[in-house]
Amino acid sequence: MTQCNGFLGGQLLIAMPGMNDKRFMRSVIYICAHSDAGAMGIILNQLHHIDFPELLLHLGVIDSGQKKCLSEPIKQFPVRYGGPVDPSRGFVLHSDDYACEETVFIADKVCFTATIDILKAISCEQGPQHALVALGYAGWKAGQLEAEISTNGWLISSTSPSFLFESDLSCKYDKSLTRMGIDPTYLASEMGHA
């Protein structure tokens, strides 16, 4: 297991109301990695159109016979749209009770693994206690995220594992703002100067 920390790693990005890119409107993104070379994160509050059993079948983790035998919680396990970059690749944010050689520790008991093995473990209910599976990710080249933040595109917030792995996606945007002490109804898309 390796450790990844720096800049905004382990923080949330919350899209401002003036976000012009429709792919990121009302998005809450967990930053997995951030350095001088760029940034990478997973959108937390958008569902993907594929369900978990179909994803497992598509990746060859299970066959059609095994699909029928999956437990109900596994059949209902949500797959998130992680972002527009590499949309066919799977990524798992998870609690630190699961680790393999490829696992990266991000922050505060949160890890990141992008292997078939973790999907197999989750499908057999032998994976991490908390997990978030996503297809694709949000990526920024060097200086791009910093520029978007400086032009009022994103708010930055700390988070906790309990909030990160909370399953209710419909309220995650508003809850992210409320946790910062911001009433979403009063958040303006334009910034002012005195």
Swiss-Prot record:
InterPro entries: AlgH-like (IPR003774)
Pfam families linked: DUF179 (PF02622)
Domain of life per record: Bacteria
NCBIfam families linked: PRK00228.1-4
UniProt name for this protein: UPF0301 protein BT_0659
Organism whose genome encodes this protein: Bartonella tribocorum (strain CIP 105476 / IBS 506)
Gene3D superfamilies linked: VC0467-like
GO cellular component: cytosol
Sequence similarity: Belongs to the UPF0301 (AlgH) family.
